[in-house]
Amino acid sequence: MSQVFQQDLTDTSVRPGGLFFIELLMAEHFDMPGRDTMVEVLTKYLGPVDCFDHRRDSAGFAPQNYKVHYEDTDADIPPTLMVTNCEKIDKPVLDDFDRSQVWDCPNVDELLAECQYRVFATDMLASGLAAKERADMLVKYVDALLELYPSCKAVVFGPSRKFLSRESIENHPDKEVTRFMYYAVNVRYFSIQGTNDMMVDSVGMSTLFLPDLQYHFHGVDPNHVVFHAYNVL
């Protein structure tokens, strides 16, 4: 019998334009790469970066090819890319609801059991970037992080909770900015208890101040609706 979930109408964790964060999951502890190595790899993918912080527990970078204009000071300032130290996972990475919406990783349970450590990475002060510019920065940031952390086996993207294996990211045929939709946007499927109705929605596009979608329907193959959602996005 399928598990029944109750929607939390008080949840405000998904905020348009909010932080984009990811979790890099790995089986063993992995020390943060050295400052020079991180600058070299990030520069390879993102262009010139300034490293303004590199300590045991975190590192911070400013990608110079991406600038947010602040009208009050008439200044163009790069956003911030942050990486935390590797830590032991002390509670489930995905709750039951998130796990029910993993569609692109058949061995998700195996990876969740194997990966006992994680690294958090996020952007900050990036909401002022144009949607395409921010998406471009973020997908390249993901590529750089996978090179910096070769033991990473899977990635969880927030706030959509999209779960992808390392291989599916590296082997994805789309190498353009549009892969943001594959990485960071989760199209979810629900059947509504006590009815023949179904719902498909997306979560993740609001990070770029772009609209997410919701379909409420019955009598239609949900796979067709999911396909339509990705095409519309």
Segments from the language model and where they lie:
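A short, structural micro-pattern
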Residues: 16-18, 62, 75-77, 112-115, ...
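Aromatic/basic-lined ligand-recognition segments
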Residues: 157-233
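Internal, hydrophobic cores of structured domains that mediate oligomerization or house catalytic pockets
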Residues: 83-186
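N-terminal low-complexity, intrinsically disordered segments
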Residues: 30-110
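Glycine-rich, often proline-containing surface loops adjacent to acidic residues and nearby aromatics
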Residues: 17-21, 110-128, 204-214
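Conserved aromatic-histidine-acidic binding/catalytic patches
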Residues: 26, 30, 126-134, 217-224
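Hydrophobic, Leu/Ile/Phe/Ala-enriched alpha-helical segments that form helix-helix packing faces
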Residues: 38-50, 141-149, 229-233
